């Protein structure tokens, strides 16, 4: 379905409810620049470097796009998805079933989730929705539950510290969304709905959190304006 949620009756505050879940795939493909290309980059990299039967847990898996891509790349992967939205998980499970894929899903608040040891954790556009006081604690848990030489892939919308640059990047992003078919009204309405829900950090703040959690080797593998993907290695 096409995302027209903010066309007439803007939501007071953004949440991943049934209305969002029903249009999520269209929404994210039109709202996150190079979403599919970045998803494939990360998936192909993991498929290339991970050992047989590697376990991968997608934290904030939404409609399972990344997990489904991974499952089709390597049949030996052990795949898990966690999300706090029942509506999003309903879509994820339906898609996995339609493709005949064996993916385990958990409905949980990530800050309260009973983590288990994995080779890879993925947090694509997830940390930005976690309340700031809880982010470091969550990253600490992720690091603790990674196997030796484990990997975290983390994609985030980021802030620029320079006000002039930030203003112009935000305007370029709005231009991008207009080219994807969103009206100025829809863009403004969604921005208002996301205020105090999606709280981005700067690149430096994200790197500091990763380092504080214990990651020593951190690289940026994708960036477009105010969107960036980090890969961090344990040990």
From Swiss-Prot:
Superkingdom as given in the UniProt entry: Bacteria
rRNA processing keyword on record: no
CDD domains, per the entry: AdoMet_MTases
Pfam families xrefs: Methyltransf_25 (PF13649)
Binding site residues for S-adenosyl-L-methionine: 35, 60-62, 83-84, 124, 191
Keywords, alphabetical: S-adenosyl-L-methionine, Transferase
Function: Catalyzes the conversion of S-adenosyl-L-methionine (SAM) to carboxy-S-adenosyl-L-methionine (Cx-SAM).
Designated name of the protein: Carboxy-S-adenosyl-L-methionine synthase
Source species of the chain: Campylobacter jejuni subsp. doylei (strain ATCC BAA-1458 / RM4099 / 269.97)
Gene expressing this chain: cmoA
